[in-house]
Amino acid sequence: MNLIIDIGNTVAKVALFDRTSMVEVVYDSNQSLDSLEAVCNKYDVRKAIVATVIDLNECVLAQLNKLPVPVLWLDSHTSLPVINLYETPETLGYDRMAAVVAAHDQFPGKDILVIDAGTCITYEFVDSLGQYHGGNISPGLWMRLKALHQFTGRLPLVHAEGRMPDMGKDTETAIRAGVKKGIEYEITGYITAMKHKYPELLVFLTGGDDFSFDTKLKSVIFADRFLVLKGLNRILNYNNGRI
């Protein structure tokens, strides 16, 4: 079994893969990894990969360093099954690259736009030759809602869930509709522009936030909430024998 440890800005995910098939995923605190020991005792883990976008505290580091299997710590020097053309690979978030790797692994030989709607919304492009050209970073749903509250004097902090008319009927619905529809239009705009350049473009959407798209747009999107975990597993398998 492969142990995949994905430590994000808000939560950690601990997943188990049997070769290329995901067996289980556990959501955990990124400050403690309480589930790690139980997961390791439950399965016959042979190797692991650790990927983090935050600085790990001593408790988490101690747990990871006690893992009784070879561990691949994902960084800018890790060998990848795609060609990385990013000019500053040391600043590239592991989650961005892992999502690209997973999408390319599923559809090699295709031009692919990968959209990850999480804390931030990222847009990544990998071409049919497996060359990762880079991507863009935009504020995510919660970040936009929070910014409207923090950087103004009177706008309230609005929850993402709730009534959302086409045009807001009060301040709460105006903020919710403005932010969520703004994100939907942004994503639609990226897809439209990229498909103009690459008519056979495939689109992957992952991340924790769900958005509504019209029927025509839905037909070109592959939604996969576990794309990053699958990419990390692919990277671990690709580096088999190097750890």
Curated annotation (Swiss-Prot):
Signal peptide: none annotated. It is an enzyme of class 2 (transferase). Pathway: Cofactor biosynthesis; coenzyme A biosynthesis; CoA from (R)-pantothenate: step 1/5. Its EC number is 2.7.1.33. GO terms for molecular function: ATP binding; metal ion binding; pantothenate kinase activity. Its main location: cytoplasm. Catalyzes the phosphorylation of pantothenate (Pan), the first step in CoA biosynthesis. This is Type III pantothenate kinase. It comes from Bacteroides fragilis (strain YCH46). The lineage of its organism: Bacteria, Pseudomonadati, Bacteroidota, Bacteroidia, Bacteroidales.
